[in-house]
Amino acid sequence: MDIRAAEISAILKEQIKNFGKEAEVSEVGQVLSVGDGIARVYGLDNVQAGEMVEFPGGIRGMALNLESDNVGVVIFGADRDIKEGDIVKRTGAIVDVPVGPGLLGRVVDALGNPIDGKGPIVATERRRVDVKAPGIIPRKSVHEPMSTGLKAVDALIPVGRGQRELVIGDRQTGKTAIILDTFLNQKPIHDNGPDSEKLYCVYVAIGQKRSTVAQFVKVLEERGALEYSIVIAATASDPAPMQYLAPFAGCAMGEYFRDNSMHALIGYDDLSKQAVAYRQMSLLLRRPPGREAYPGDVFYLHSRLLERAAKLNDENGAGSLTALPVIETQGNDVSAFIPTNVISITDGQIFLETNLFYQGIRPAVNVGLSVSRVGSSAQVKAMKQVAGSIKGELAQYREMAAFAQFGSDLDASTQRLLNRGARLTELLKQPQFSPLKTEEQVAVIFAGVNGYLDKIAVNQVGKFEAGLLSSLRTEHKDVLDAIRDEKALTDNIKAKLKAAVDAFAKSFA
């Protein structure tokens, strides 16, 4: 038997060339230390920033700090099952979540896993959670109304589709209630409105009690609004990385509708807790602290999230994503770090006040401090026609009311202003879970601005409103339909509406 040296060396070369290939297939690293939801990992040389990595037992993490000798990984889950020396694998994918209509009616966590016990999610597509916002060219200015069903908001601080309107106030002032009522107000459109007007709702609960989230979902379910809503929950007991990720995950789910020529609305409840979670992660990752110990890029955290809410132009499908971020203030301090940041990013704010809430003015909107910077161009013309003067009248009323506490003998015009203001304030009150259609709001505010309430006692205003609405719904449905179809108060409609209100006012007296 002769030995062929060339053949042997060729085989050896081939084997040497393939040696050690298996070990490189999934790049791995080793846990150096773990605690407080953060793991320091040695190895993972080629890991990308924001890449998903996997720990033993299927626990996921995200590489955030890429340092010269180790990688700082935040852990999406319990860190008690991870120990020093564990092997960490790269997944090669940036953190993504399932998106699409299959998520409607479901409650999921920040990674898109179902937590409502209704079986697996049927999703055809996955999206990265952190993508760049649309540029300037694909956008269009906000011009379609996004009705909340609340008179105080739709008349005075209107929100348009694609706008970012901040809801800000102390704890227990009804911030979540505004989002909930807005979701419920979309029910009639989903039942029998055109597809182009349907608004899909996404609710992100960050750092809230589980009981609160369960209550929110229960109300949506009972009122038939869960079928067009998605709830993302990162509750108070979830790790900080989940609370940090939840808004981005919700945004990706909302963007699916925006990019497919549909309209979506997302409520982030609330971003103060996301900032706190991000601060905790940053400090544990040893990033340098800034003002109020928040990291230097906490402004960028919120701006890159909220910039993704947009109205796209017709070439890009004309879809929209409207954002209602919530910020909780401490003792009405709007000048703290996070509130000022988010106020400067958004297109206006609805400012809720504890004092008003306890006076029984609910929704407790402070009309003087609340603004909508782009909403007026989206307001329905009919609403503009009737509500134009309200804001001024209410501002004058507040000024006079403060002044009238001192003087007893007021002239007739001041007295008239005070009377009108008190009745308008009463008119803007609204119980929870009872959103009104735009045409009904127009009719009610028309009655208020045209002096029909001036002769009625303040405590009878609510009764007058309820009576007027039921009379319009039953006997004058044609007037409401005309306002809805025309979207403006023509002379003809105005005359009909005036006649209807006149008739009711006579019978009410």
From Swiss-Prot:
Instruction: List keywords of the entry alphabetically.
Output: ATP synthesis, ATP-binding, Cell inner membrane, Cell membrane, CF(1), Hydrogen ion transport, Ion transport, Membrane, Nucleotide-binding, Translocase, Transport
Q: Is Ion transport there in the keyword field? A: yes
List, alphabetically, the Gene3D superfamilies matched.
Answer: 2.40.30.20, ATP synthase alpha/beta chain, C-terminal domain, P-loop containing nucleotide triphosphate hydrolases
Tree of life domain: Bacteria
Record carries keyword Translocase: yes
CDD domains in UniProt: ATP-synt_F1_alpha_C (cd18113), ATP-synt_F1_alpha_N (cd18116), F1-ATPase_alpha_CD (cd01132)
Location, primary (coarse class): membrane
Q: Where is this site: Required for activity?
A: S370
Q: Name one GO molecular function term.
A: ATP binding
Pfam families according to UniProt: ATP-synt_ab (PF00006), ATP-synt_ab_C (PF00306), ATP-synt_ab_N (PF02874)
Q: Where in the cell is it found?
A: Cell inner membrane
The way this protein sits in the membrane is described as: Peripheral membrane protein
EC identifiers of the protein: 7.1.2.2
Q: Which GO terms describe its cellular component?
A: plasma membrane; proton-transporting ATP synthase complex
Residues annotated to bind ATP:
G169, D170, R171, Q172, T173, G174, K175, T176
User: What general EC class does the enzyme of this chain belong to?
Assistant: translocase
What PANTHER family does the database record attribute to this sequence? ATP SYNTHASE SUBUNIT ALPHA, MITOCHONDRIAL
Subunit: F-type ATPases have 2 components, CF(1) - the catalytic core - and CF(0) - the membrane proton channel. CF(1) has five subunits: alpha(3), beta(3), gamma(1), delta(1), epsilon(1). CF(0) has three main subunits: a(1), b(2) and c(9-12). The alpha and beta chains form an alternating ring which encloses part of the gamma chain. CF(1) is attached to CF(0) by a central stalk formed by the gamma and epsilon chains, while a peripheral stalk is formed by the delta and b chains.
Supply the NCBIfam families for this chain: atpA, PRK13343.1
Q: What does this protein do?
A: Produces ATP from ADP in the presence of a proton gradient across the membrane. The alpha chain is a regulatory subunit.
Descriptive protein name: ATP synthase subunit alpha
Organismal lineage: Bacteria, Pseudomonadati, Pseudomonadota, Alphaproteobacteria, Hyphomicrobiales
